[in-house]
Amino acid sequence: NTALYPLMGIEVGTTVHFPMTTQELQAALAKIGIDGKRYSEVFFTSFDSDVLGLYDHLYECENIDELNELGHALLEVRDKGGLETFEAALVLGNHTRSVKDLINLTQNLDLYRFYPDISDDEGLGRLYADELGTIDIPEHIQNYFDYEAYGRDVRINEGGVFAPGGYVSAVPEGFKEYYHGPQDIPPEHRIFAYPEKAEPVHSILAALKRFQEAPPAPKKDKAGPSHEER
């Protein structure tokens, strides 16, 4: 709730998950006192995502409907097996300056060449020379060929980068702008609507006070190793 911070010096907020429904959004807005009358503005204090690096490209005043559209677009990318390519494209850094760019990026992933598990110039050189056949190396000099230098030249010429999941580069031309702004969001993905009734501010503040004054929870014994730790 944007208004309560300068007035009272506290952040009154809640966590939401995209994509979401209008009903879920209204419940979240009501919880922090947003009714569209006395209080109507919201901002985001932080982002988190299973999509590696996505939160670095999101900002506090993002449009809620656009974030929801991005959420739906990313689900579609995931279902098509393209999340690693999208994550690598974020590292490449083209078309990542706004949510509008990110939505368009999800629809242009066919322009990106992504090779998983390629993490250095030598590996890239071997991939291009031995597997993709981009250069003919006579058999009698293969043991002396500088794959690292060749891979470096490939990377520089393509403008590619090594991302956490592999190597990525993009076709220089052909990126299309399918999404031009909120007017292009399908009706079923437009969720923003104020709730009919919001939680009174005094109730919110009382709940915060109770939380702040509550004794700390007792420490539990350390649990056994998680699945990831094993």
PLM features: what roles do these ranges have?
Residues N1-L7, S46-S49, V168-V171:
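Short, flexible beta-strand-to-coil junctions
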Residues N1-R38:
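N-terminal ordered "arm"
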Residues T14, V42, G166, E228:
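A broad, low-specificity signal marking well-ordered, structured residues that form hydrophobic/aromatic
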Residues T22-L25, D121-E122, Y147:
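Alpha-helix initiation and N-capping motif
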Residues K31-N143, P172-V201:
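Mixed-charge (acidic/basic) macromolecular-recognition segments
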Residues D146, V201-R230:
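Non-Sec secretion/translocation targeting segments of pathogen effectors
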